[in-house]
A protein has these predicted regions:
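Conserved lysine of the Walker
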Residues: 37
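Short regulatory helix/loop adjacent to the ATP-binding pocket of P-loop NTPases
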Residues: 126-142, 154-159
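Structural recognition of the conserved hydrophobic beta-strand(s) that form the central parallel beta-sheet
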Residues: 117-123, 144, 153
Length: 299
């Protein structure tokens, strides 16, 4: 069963899911790792229970759990079939189902064999969002989930925006935290721009050292490991060097707004000694750099 903890609502996404409830397409929630997809599934499960759906009508499977991660598609099908209640509509929730080989066969079989409403999450570590419709024969609707908006950032961190009046009568918006300490709106927005909108930040507060440590872990997982793993599964043998990928990312980030070419990326990295790690000899080919840049664009 999907584990539970304190859930913070993401109403804009939850309302989209509710709008597609009990419709034929498979609901696929996509987005970057750690952006809140699993929590959205839990919110939808809670909504169903609050509106009268019985717990036994809901089947939840999290494929990051040790209970399920070694299952085959046949195992998943049998697990669900054993829990189907005849004459009842079932609600199936699959978190990171794409870890299972031939997962789409099981999902398509559920649609044919049972009266069910299906919800699936998937990160870019396994499939690009454009690939889901292909695997599900076009019978899916995608909910693209993003990190927190600024409004959500305020809510998650317990900030309250109030309109106050200055001594001269001017109205302005100020922000108050849970302890009623007051901040200028631009201060909080600066924190949002610096730390970003990953929901997990709310669990550690806005202490810079903790936040940066958390973000570094997310960056290493999302940008480096996920891209390398996905491209390896897709047979892209050129994309195997995490150091080169990280350097290309840093180069592109440092040159936002500038015109750069594929050739200039490799040349600059070598000329500035950024690839002098004792492993890579010479300038990476334009074809190799292009493959890494394409992987970043698609992720």
């Amino acid at each position: 069963m999907i584990d539970s903890h304190e859930l913070r609502r993401r109403d804009s996404y939850l309302n989209k899911l509710i709008g597609f409830q009990d419709t034929e397409p498979v609901k696929v929630i996509t987005g970057i790792r750690r952006c809140g997809k699993s929590s959205l599934l839990k919110l939808m499960v809670q909504h169903l229970k609050d509106t009268g759906v019985l717990p036994e009508q809901i089947i939840e499977m999290n494929f990051e759990s040790f209970d399920f991660h070694k299952m085959s598609a046949d195992d998943v099908y049998r697990y669900v079939k054993e829990r189907i209640i005849a004459g009842k509509r079932m609600y199936l929730f699959f978190d990171e189902l794409q870890r299972i080989k031939a997962w789409e066969d099981a999902v398509n079989a559920f649609r044919v064999d049972f009266d069910c409403d299906i919800y699936v999450t998937g990160s870019n570590a396994y499939l690009l969002s454009s690939e889901y419709a292909t695997y599900l024969s076009g019978r899916c609707v995608e909910i693209k989930m993003l990190p927190l908006s600024f409004r959500e950032f305020l809510d998650f961190h317990g900030f309250d925006v109030r309109e106050t009046q200055s001594a001269l009568g001017w109205l302005r918006k100020q922000v108050f935290d849970k302890n009623n300490e007051r901040y200028e709106l631009r201060e909080v927005f600066a924190a949002y721009m610096r730390f970003g909108g990953m929901p997990g930040i709310a669990d550690v507060g806005l202490e810079q050292e903790k936040v940066l440590a958390l973000l570094d872990g997310i960056y290493s997982t999302v940008v480096i490991r996920d891209i390398l793993e996905r491209e390896t599964r897709r047979g892209q043998k050129q994309i195997t060097d995490p150091a080169l990928l990280r350097k290309i990312i840093l180069f592109l980030a440092d040159n936002i707004g500038s015109s750069v070419s594929i050739a200039s990326i490799g040349n600059t990295l070598v000329n500035e000694g950024l690839l002098d790690d004792g492993k890579r000899k010479g300038t990476p080919s334009a074809h190799t750099v292009q493959a890494y840049v394409n992987a970043l664009l698609e992720s």
